[in-house]
């Protein structure tokens, strides 16, 4: 609002160094009015803006004016005929430090007052000409030219020149260089003619300021070379290196410390890598592939052996075969199998003969042809030449008396076993792996004792990997035998334990596949050794009597092989004539038992089971007496005894009925015993409850007595209190105060005495109650102990009286009542004799027959 009011005012006061623009509305021309001035505005004039401060450019500053006014040689502003200021339209004018000046109509400030740019030492401004002009020194500049304004100095801008960038000098330190590239053809700072894109290096220590047409590509640091590091470089274009040697494109070489201590790669060199020194000690060597010859060129396809002590750098194109290798130091128990790669004369093999042929002046070598194999034995220190290839390192194999290895001659193919001596394979021998059947491998790998672990077939034993080149050995336990068959000789040999059996290259174990489990199943037991016994085997068989009673028998047989030591070859071979002697023997015995039992009744079998089974198994001799054993003539197996472990009915209904009758008898006896014990316990419990109630009544009476005494004391206290009050009322009113005080004192004493009496009575009551409660607890615990003792005595007496009252005959009748009923039921079915037993409580019939025979013999003696 103030500015608008000021512009509309007729009188405008212009301070010093201020100005305004006044527009003549008749001619439409603006002019400048400069203060200090009091300007009176005419009616046809309009002030365009309020007084504005003149432009002030301080020293070392400048500003840029757009559309500047035209001035004459004396610096005066030029006007046209109408009085308007002449302007250089679209032109610029840079004004430096001067007196304050106004902006004429049409002039604009394109760039405000700005400090002049100071160019410091080792820096420069890269300038570019926008227009053709001539500098004060007479040098002509064409639009597009670029040059440098180097410091130190202050840059005065021109309208024809623009500043592209500020360039700083690059500091070059020791062992450094800068790589430059020419952006335009011309001379560099050294005066050398450069073409566009050309690169060169400057390694002079100090600050380097690139020229206007130069650009810094990179700062290259020198590679410090030592005795342990070298530089592998490659030429990327033909040039002459620092050593004065001409290099071709693609050529590679090493720069070592012998050439220079620090190497700065030139623009024509490419660093491939840093090569470490290869150091060999006195016990190392290496084989260099494609070695560089004396002419500096790699000899492709050749090898060179270098032995320590030595340090060297691998030249470009060279590489080590298998790296740095240790020299072969062989002892007396070691050797090397060598093969010739090329034909040569071997002098290494004659070193052992030199000691015996010292008289010979000239040493003769051995001619080796490509592919020849030979063995070098220790002790020796050996470095294989380039014409020899090391195939194997042999080490002597120490063998004990019971150890051996399989050796095959690779020329003849024959395999032999070397046992009991330290042996080193020759160049024509190799270890041979003996393959065994899978079942034999598993049996040998298991750490199972054939005798102690013969029944642990379900348990898994630890298995160790077998060395197939070692001679297969097996320790035969005591009282056992093993059969080994030689397939080349077609012979078998039998060995008896304790012994160590070792297989030849063509020998194999005879594996026995025996029956096992209960009942017997074939191919359950796999074993190599055959136990000679004595031992036992158990089998379960099912038989049927003449009256069709099916029974299941579990029998155990004691067996052994009848063999006299030392045994001849025929007897030993007969042991393995029957592959499954267990299954065959069990089947034969089961067949005999079934045949014998099928012709007898169940009742007879029940009474004479042992005699029937033994006679069926062993048979009778000439005197009609049961034999003591059963012998199998094929392999000499002898069955010495038969143990009847259990006899159970096969029919489920018979088994259930028998079990039910036994359980019923047991339940009747148990229920009667439980009823008597329950009655006795209830009686004792009632007696204890009565004593407990009596004790409670006694305790209550004592408590009431104590309460009565308390009430009497309270009544006496009340009487004393009332008497004192009446006596005080009868006395004169004159002594009322004294009497009242004495009465109060007496009343307090009586109250305290009453409270004391009440507390004492309560304490006595509580003590009596606690004492009675403790006595009650003690009596309860004592009664509980007596109760348990009496219950135990009653139970023992009850059982004793029960047994005495029942009597032996009654118990027998009770025991026979159920079975006789079952027998009668079975007889009603047409069965002549039966045997009923509980499946969970089997009847042992092993001594039944002997008991019957013993009773008969006793009767005969009595008669």
Curated annotation (Swiss-Prot):
Gene Ontology biological process terms, A to Z: brain development; eye development; neuron projection regeneration
Cystine pairings recorded for this chain: none
Gene3D superfamilies: 2.30.30.560, 2.30.30.570, 2.30.30.620, 6.10.250.720, 6.20.380.10, Band 7 domain, Major Vault Protein repeat
MVP repeat intervals: 2-60, 61-115, 116-168, 169-221, 222-276, 277-327, 328-396, 397-471, 472-534
Keywords: Cytoplasm, Nucleus, Repeat, Ribonucleoprotein
Keyword ATP-binding: no
Coiled-coil region list: none
CDD domains linked to this entry: ATP-synt_Fo_b (cd06503), MVP_shoulder (cd08825)
Domain IQ: 677-706
Annotated Pfam families: MVP_shoulder, Vault, Vault_2, Vault_3, Vault_4
GO CC, alphabetical: cytoplasm; nucleus; ribonucleoprotein complex
Region listing for Disordered, in residue ranges: 349-368
Subcellular location: Cytoplasm; Nucleus
Stored InterPro entries: Band_7/SPFH_dom_sf, MVP, MVP_rep_dom, MVP_rep_sf, MVP_shoulder, Vault_2, Vault_2_sf, Vault_3
Top-level taxon in the UniProt lineage: Eukaryota
Subunit comment: The vault ribonucleoprotein particle is a huge (400 A x 670 A) cage structure of 12.9 MDa. It consists of a dimer of half-vaults, with each half-vault comprising 39 identical major vault protein (MVP) chains, PARP4 and one or more vault RNAs (vRNAs).
Function field: Required for normal vault structure. Vaults are multi-subunit structures that may act as scaffolds for proteins involved in signal transduction. Vaults may also play a role in nucleo-cytoplasmic transport.
Record-given protein name: Major vault protein
Organism: Danio rerio (Zebrafish)
